[in-house]
Amino acid sequence: YRTLTQDTTNLEFKGGNLGFIDKIKANVYRLNTKRDEVPNPNYELDGEVRTYGANLNLDSRLFDRHTLKYGVNWRTQKSSSNGENNEKKSDAGVYVEGIWDFSPVTLTTGLRYDRWKMKTSSNTENSDGNLNPSIGLVYDITPDFSINTSLNYATRSPRLYEAALMSSRSIISSPDLKAERSRNAEIGFNYHWNSALTLSGSYFHQQIKDVQAIRQAGQNYVWFNGGKLKNRGYELNAAYRWKGLTARAGVAYSKPKLNGDTADIVTTAIPMGRTWTTGLSYQFDNPNLEIGWRGRYVQNAGYAPTSRGSDVALNVVRAGYGVNDIFANWKPTGKDDLNVNFSVNNVFDKNYKPHSQRAGANSLPEPGRDVRLSVNYRF
């Protein structure tokens, strides 16, 4: 058996009206994740990851109609396996974002700089910095109908190796290892009718260069930039409200491809079947009680597995599934200070395997019927 423990400490401050600064939000945090496993003569899979970080986010109003957001982010990580073979990584970033109100058009512009440094268990070191711009536009054609579009660039620094497996492997990095760099373009719309009907939709196209991968070279495992990922998809949602009744429905689909093949790698994107969501709920005034039902239905998805843990077949078809949940939320005082929540997830005890796992046909099933009762009190 194994024991997984997570210890989190977070100190947060919120304030405002400090001269030019209208809003301020800052926090420092510590996260320690540890895995202890019963000793085995063939292997040791103990591991620990320590993370420290801080964030400072500021908002300033300009001319009573525009908003300027800016701040600093910092994080450092250290992982070890059985107390040895340490890996280290640090990330720091600064950003500025402007939200410009030129009614009926809202323009959003942003610029972010990220710097990272990493040291592997075999003492190979890499570091780099990236500048990422972004721009977005919302056009309110009428008070009820708007269209939007955006183009965003972002980077993700190389990740540390799995702490539990690090003790038995020599991990090095390619001398020219770079951060993954993504470009995401999106277009969408929002429509509201008479405070009853809401429709929204979007289409996106994403490209990620320098996808991080690992290969074996002799006695070493080498981090390197392994390819390019392309992903495109859409999402449509509808909601209708009448008195206390709310009905929802939606569909989402995406199609990732890595170098022309569908990706099955945990570090990139997971191919999932077209997903349909539904919901029906009713809100009573007295007592203050909401009851409802949620449904999630995923169509089957086929792909060619290319990563460890995948089925050996050349093509795998993940079966579709449907899951239903019921829930109730009661506020005895009629306010938000006291909440009693009851839910039954997977109410029909469906045996299914999710598409979000990177493994192929041999992935683990999701939990069966899950009954939960919770009471929350705020003061």
Q: What residues fall within each predicted segment?
A:
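Gram-negative outer-membrane beta-barrel transporters
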Residues: 64, 107, 199-207, 224-307, ...
